[in-house]
Amino acid sequence: MSEKINANQDNDRQITLVDDQGNEELFEILFTFTSEDYGKSYVLLYPAAVSDDDDVEVQAFSYDADEDGDVTSSDLHEISDDDEWNMVQGVLNTFLSDDRLSGE
């Protein structure tokens, strides 16, 4: 299991998150993007254990990468601003509706 995201390489596509009860869960990275309006980078994740038949709950976080582009779970930040959430949701909707981006 990897605890790092490398935003510059496609082969590091997983991160382990720990919930409030100390339970670890492995997540796959759906995609990352940067918003010039908010001056932040974002990562969208989904549980690695999801099968193709399951509905997927996507989680989004802003993040701070180090100078090598690496990110650990402690570098993820919850999105609390409604306008920021709406922007992230819009990017996700565009991704999901564009077959060229989502790989379908």
Curated annotation (Swiss-Prot):
Transmembrane regions listed in the UniProt entry: none
Pfam families (alphabetical): DUF1292
Source organism phylogeny: Bacteria, Bacillati, Bacillota, Bacilli, Lactobacillales
Source organism, top-level taxon: Bacteria
UniProt protein name: UPF0473 protein LGAS_0424
Annotated HAMAP family: UPF0473
Listed PANTHER family: UPF0473 PROTEIN CBO2561/CLC_2432, UPF0473 PROTEIN CBO2561_CLC_2432
Family recorded in the similarity comment: Belongs to the UPF0473 family.
